[in-house]
A protein has these predicted regions:
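Extracellular/periplasmic carbohydrate-active domains that bind, remodel
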Residues: 1-282
């Protein structure tokens, strides 16, 4: 029942006891090293609860996606620490692998800490059906070469009611933290249209002065993103600083990728913010 959090001096997770004291004995946590392409890929499954897991404690190699939930409902993810991975740590989505689409909703995600070559929390990019009602509290990004908190609807899905640090999963014991993150928040809408019965046609168009030729879906509506509420996040060192390539952590020296926006790919007036700060590390 204890909350897990992270000590930057020790570079280790710990538990918070009822008196607010730090407990560094995390021997109760399940250890998984070299988890492969997916540690868990669940499709069309409801009522999942994963918790108290330490990834890459002794070996940081051969770890890609951690938890992928495709077309799943009523999912709880609590107390997850990933020392490093090459892809998303927690990812809800909805694809066509069942032969039909299925909406996903009711996610309770709490106390997620990690370093990733991709995103710590990612909705999509497989969005063949709607994904709604997701509550995420207490995240700590140690480094991310993409985003800390990402939403990508590419296949017509409606992403709605996503909350970061609302307190829905329980008390907010700490402000969320994002260190060394290329784009702390990334929200995008595109038209890949990876849906059943899609029709496609070639199009030629000019974008930012460049002529592009793309195969685009013609019979699937573009997705929607609605009611995204973000609060209580401290952000610093905005660059792709994951330790995935080796050194933990390499200071910014101009060689790492950077992204100017805090929110990328979305119209800012449509998003609500409370107490969200940025401190640039370069």
């Amino acid at each position: 029942d204890k909350d897990m959090w992270y000590d930057p001096q020790k570079d280790e997770p710990y538990y918070i006891d009822a008196d607010g004291q730090k407990i560094y004995d995390v021997s109760n946590m399940l250890h998984i090293d070299q988890g492969g392409h997916f540690v868990l890929l669940a499709t069309g499954t409801d009522g999942i609860h994963v918790h108290d897991t330490y990834f890459a404690k002794h070996n940081t190699r051969n770890a890609r996606d951690i938890y992928d939930f495709m077309a799943c409902n009523d999912v709880t993810v609590t107390n997850i620490y990933s020392r490093v991975s090459s892809d998303d740590i927690v990812k809800p989505g909805s694809d066509c692998s069942l032969g039909f689409t299925r909406p996903a909703r009711n996610y309770m995600v709490r106390n997620i800490v990690g370093d990733t070559n991709c995103n710590l929390f990612q909705i999509g990019s497989e969005t063949a059906d709607d994904i709604q009602d997701l509550y995420v509290d207490n995240i700590y990004v140690l480094g991310a070469n993409k985003a800390g908190f990402s939403i990508s609807t590419n296949d017509g899905g409606h992403i709605k009611n996503v909350y970061l640090n609302s307190g829905k999963t329980g008390a907010i014991h700490s402000r969320s933290v994002m260190h060394r993150t290329r784009a702390p928040f990334f929200i995008s809408i595109s038209n890949r249209g990876r849906v059943l019965g899609a029709n496609v046609a070639p199009f030629t168009f000019t974008e930012n002065g460049n002529v592009r030729k793309e195969l685009l879906v013609t019979n699937s509506d573009i997705g929607q993103v609605e009611n995204i509420v973000i609060c209580g996040v401290d952000i610093d060192e905005v660059y792709g600083g994951s330790s995935f390539r080796g050194e933990r952590w390499k200071a910014y020296d101009g060689s790492q990728s950077t992204a100017t926006p805090i929110i990328a790919g979305f119209k800012l007036p449509d998003i609500h913010f409370w107490k969200l700060y940025e401190r640039r590390g370069y």
